[in-house]
Amino acid sequence: YPPADAGGSDSFTEADFTAHVEHLKKKLPSDDFTIVVQKPFVVIGDEPADDVREHSVRTVKWAVDKLKQEYFSKDPNEILDIWLFKNATSYERNAQLLFGDKPTTPYGYYSSTHKALVMNISTGGGTLVHEIVHPFIEANFPNCPPWLNEGLGSLYEQTGELQGRIHGFTNWRLPGLQAAITL
């Protein structure tokens, strides 16, 4: 793989992505997985292939395009994997099998150590968009404080598009934030 300081995945070649996919194929837990290159990520999922492709375009590509339009000039520093598991059972089993992780959230998480976004996609795409923010923050604002990194991700926990721009809508995190502010 190219070194981490190669200048972001926008500098990675087709050959880099092809080699990455070939490496991934060797570690797939079963033949039930579909792999889609959706630059700057590689999306891997155990839902039907059409569903994985739809998530890669309608959520991953859309979020990447809109977030870059608003905030980010550089892609993540490495080729990262987005693992989309079809349900809680698959998510928990495969997070353990692939990464030795026991998820602390039912939705998903970003692991910079494993260069992976790990999702229970049955809970929706909100957490996926939230987690996509983190590797972009790392690449574009390496000294960003954790509260801002999480805050920006949380803003996009429920997203849509207004006037061609990404828009974060009120989501389940607001009551907790309001309670913390009033303490």
Regions found by a protein language model. Name each.
Residues 149-183:
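Flexible, glycine-rich surface segments
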Residues 13, 20, 30-149, 159-162, ...:
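Juxtacatalytic substrate-recognition/specificity segment
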Residues 22-24, 183:
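Pan-zinc metallopeptidase signature
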